[in-house]
Regions:
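Ribosome-associated RNA-binding proteins
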Residues: 1-178
Length: 178
């Protein structure tokens, strides 16, 4: 019985893949801090980060509308995403909470210090940055719901469930889910 379950999971349209990995650093203020956080994201992903601007001015925080106060990097492609997730999970000692997985196949977790990631060294000019990581898991045909022309719904049985996402992470990245 177990072999038929794995055969079903490996069948063409049932195969789970990584759609994208999004890494976010919320700096909270503009200027030099955003530049330093940008260097961190470039070291980790080898991509140029995209700045996120403040939606409104908040006097107590010292932010003004339109100022860049955060950075986001989106990585796509199976091999690049797997290599990046592996490095990020090593920083977490390959442990995750079951609450990190949602009902639609997304996984989110945080890192308190970027220097825990293998290959990243501490630079006193940059400092230490924490970040949020979100991973989207999907099956072939997931674009059907996102495309502009002839978009349609993806059935409930075709959406990646929480249990399937946990199994995928255990199998692909040897993660311990608590």
């Amino acid at each position: 019985m177990a072999s038929t379950q794995t055969e079903k999971a490996d069948a063409g349209m049932r195969k789970i893949s990584i759609g994208k990995v999004v890494i976010n650093i919320g700096v909270g203020k503009s200027g030099e801090a955003v530049e330093r956080a940008s260097k961190v994201l470039e070291q980790i992903t080898s991509q140029k980060p995209n700045p996120r601007k403040a939606k409104k001015s908040i006097r107590d925080f010292g932010t003004h509308e339109g100022e860049p106060i955060g950075l986001v990097v989106t990585t796509r492609g199976q091999e690049r995403c797997k290599e990046l997730i592996t490095r990020l999970l090593i920083a977490r000692e390959r442990k995750m909470n079951s609450s990190s997985f949602d009902e639609r196949g997304s996984v989110s977790f945080g890192l308190k210090e970027h220097i825990e990631i293998p290959g990243i060294r501490y630079d006193p000019e940059i400092g230490i940055w924490g970040m949020n990581v979100s991973v989207l898991l999907e099956r072939p045909g997931g674009r059907v719901s996102r495309r502009l022309r002839k978009s349609n719904k993806v059935g409930k049985s075709h959406v990646v469930s929480k249990d399937e996402a946990i199994e995928y992470f255990k199998r692909e990245f040897e993660v311990v889910v608590e």
